């Protein structure tokens, strides 16, 4: 048992050049946990609040000194002397001290950084790897799996400065036998995609998550480029590699007229038409997972989409559920989607994140662990994916160290666990077992 002796917050810089909160939690015996909060670009309206200073003279208003001050003062005072291994209690103290529904007093960025740093410090004090401690906190000690990567190799929407409406076009190396082999397949497809794009005279500049961000005439053209790259790399699309998309539909949904307006290809759809547009893409390409295929508030549209596609495609709720058990519970009751994206800064603590994963799994939904578009070298989500045996992870493409840090941590974990952490491949995806 080790008590907290010191909590430190500081302002550091994320992968987009914006400030974020880093926290250190120090325990008796010299054990230290260090963690940083990520930050999203396309955010759900019901996410926990990321506290920014709003001082335009400093970091264009994006400073986080208020959140850092909360860590160094109110949070530190409340936590010193508390037992670090009581993660749920630590998180509850911060949530109650904040006292708001959406963590707007201290900021989810402050509370999450401390929550994760505390878990890391507790793991260190127990002489355990973080993934093993997370499995204990999850009530599933010793139960692990290596996640199937969903690699975002063409970026559009809010993650790129191009004319592609759909935010992420991803590959899943389902033919791999191990996580390490999956990363090799992903890297080979990524490099071949660069050749395909260059051959078409298209840009190979990368977006926030390390994927390419070319100007393409349509979403189908993005899928066609990926198909060509998969084949060029010597793999079979649909067998070795499957496809996934994050539509981030809320970003092009017009609330006034209820239409999905895809400006990049000059098309507008009603809610049901958009579902059938996606259905058409699924018939043409082996797309096994679609995230946020409707606006976060269009629950009727989601219900229809689940009815049409839910038995054959994993339908992931991101902006829809925002890692929030209250919203997820309602979605489960109404038969909305069949999977949840897990981003721990949407809810703001490790305990609440684990509760969302458990609720999803208990209801037969899958849980996909995810990064944010603004990241740091912090690789906690790799341990979270393994320690909860979630089965799937989204942490970007095969470039940018902020993305690769997570993949490299997964390589280390797979090496340490060997056969104790099976790589499930396509079986991890809802509707594909």
Curated annotation (Swiss-Prot):
Q: Name one GO molecular function term.
A: phosphopyruvate hydratase activity
**Keywords (A to Z) from UniProt:** Cytoplasm, Glycolysis, Lyase, Magnesium, Metal-binding, Secreted
Where does this protein chiefly localize? Answer: cytoplasm
Q: Where is the active site?
A: 209 (proton donor), 343 (proton acceptor)
Catalytic activity, per the record? Answer: (2R)-2-phosphoglycerate = phosphoenolpyruvate + H2O
One GO process term, biological-process aspect: glycolytic process
Write the protein's name.
Answer: Enolase
Q: Please give the subunit comment from the record.
A: Component of the RNA degradosome, a multiprotein complex involved in RNA processing and mRNA degradation.
Query: GO CC terms for this protein?
Result: cell surface; extracellular region; phosphopyruvate hydratase complex
Q: Write down the HAMAP family for this protein, in alphabetical order.
A: Enolase (MF_00318)
Kindly give the SUPFAM superfamilies that the UniProt entry links to this protein: Enolase C-terminal domain-like, Enolase N-terminal domain-like
Organism, scientific name: Histophilus somni (strain 2336) (Haemophilus somnus)
- Cofactor details (free text): Binds a second Mg(2+) ion via substrate during catalysis.
Q: What is its EC number?
A: 4.2.1.11
Cross-referenced PROSITE patterns, in alphabetical order?
ENOLASE (PS00164)
